Amino acid sequence: MKTERVNVNVNNQPYPIYIGENLLQDKSLLQRHVKGRQVMIVSNETIAAFYLDPLKAIYQDFQCDTFILPDGEQYKTLEYWEHILHKLASCNHHRDTTLIALGGGVVGDITGFAAACYQRGVDFIQVPTTLLAQVDASIGGKTAVNHPVGKNLIGAFHQPKAVIIDLNTLNTLPEREFKAGMAEIVKAALIKDEKFFTDLENKMSDLLQRNFIFLQAVIKRAAEIKRDIVNADEKERSGERALLNLGHTFAHAIERLLGYGQWLHGEAVSAGLVLAAQLSHRKNLLDFESLQRICRLLTQISLPIHFPKSINADELLSAMYMDKKVANERLHLILLEDLGHAVVSDQVDDRELKSFLENG
């Protein structure tokens, strides 16, 4: 399989996304984006058991330190972020060090935030090992940790030096996490590319069988969609990048109310996508057939299309206001005018939203 490359260029800071097989064995590739002689690999207990030793071997001629997190969203906290910084300082890492995030979205987010803050900013490389991280979390430079009040409330924009996607890491990904990652691919299609959405409908059976040929193509397309949006609006100033939050205001509220880690992020995103589509239909933006197609595709993937019965409308609405997509005390929701065409809207007031959440 030929390795595919997607080039990102944010504020004249270009970096590549590589997508292929056996990339974790490519010494030249993995050393190419390290400018100094120090690296620290951050991973979690689950991923480290599979991939840490081979990656450490690549850097055997470097000062190579490691920090291993427990596995789970509940550990994406200021406490563990501080532990990473302490390890960097205690091992005497300098400004030319490089952090390597080996893992899923939690590892990538907390490692990137540590890199953004250590000595006012050092390099880091994303090596995402979950489908969700490969198509979304590793791309675009958003780094953060969670706070009891809300998800990703504390963080920074800090672009990686490279994103290295080894498809072989998907062989060890549990089925539930693999399917959760599909939610972000569906989201990318809904935002910008109706043809891509149709392709997903036609190829989903092969994708769920982890066919690498098809997976490489859809990961590349999802990465291109995010690349184009991030290049145009790195820090959500123009509103373009806000489109990537389709379904996420609902999703983040669901995650917080259930307790981080009870639902995977992609599972909450799936329910959020359906809520956004249903609200779009209610406001006469999205036709019923398109809404049905979204629900059918997510159901085929075995992802949730309803938010949990244990959460009531008042709780969900209150939690949504702790999201970052609030401006001038109004929720800015991402809605769909069509498959492949998302828009930012502040035209949903609390009364309408509460009625929608209570009655659908």
Swiss-Prot record:
Q: Which UniProt keywords apply?
A: Amino-acid biosynthesis, Aromatic amino acid biosynthesis, Cobalt, Cytoplasm, Lyase, Metal-binding, NAD, Nucleotide-binding, Zinc
Q: Which classification does the entry list for the species?
A: Bacteria, Pseudomonadati, Pseudomonadota, Gammaproteobacteria, Legionellales
Q: What is its subcellular localisation?
A: Cytoplasm
The coenzyme or cofactor needed here is:
NAD(+); Co(2+); Zn(2+)
Q: How are cofactors bound according to the entry's free-text note?
A: Binds 1 divalent metal cation per subunit. Can use either Co(2+) or Zn(2+).
Cross-referenced NCBIfam families: aroB (TIGR01357)
Q: Which Gene3D superfamilies match?
A: 3.40.50.1970, Dehydroquinate synthase-like - alpha domain
Specify the domain of life of the species encoding this protein.
Bacteria
Q: What is this protein called?
A: 3-dehydroquinate synthase
Q: Name one Pfam family in it.
A: DHQ_synthase
Q: What does the record give under GO molecular function?
A: 3-dehydroquinate synthase activity; metal ion binding; nucleotide binding
Reactions catalysed, as given in the entry: 7-phospho-2-dehydro-3-deoxy-D-arabino-heptonate = 3-dehydroquinate + phosphate
Q: Which family does it belong to?
A: Belongs to the sugar phosphate cyclases superfamily. Dehydroquinate synthase family.
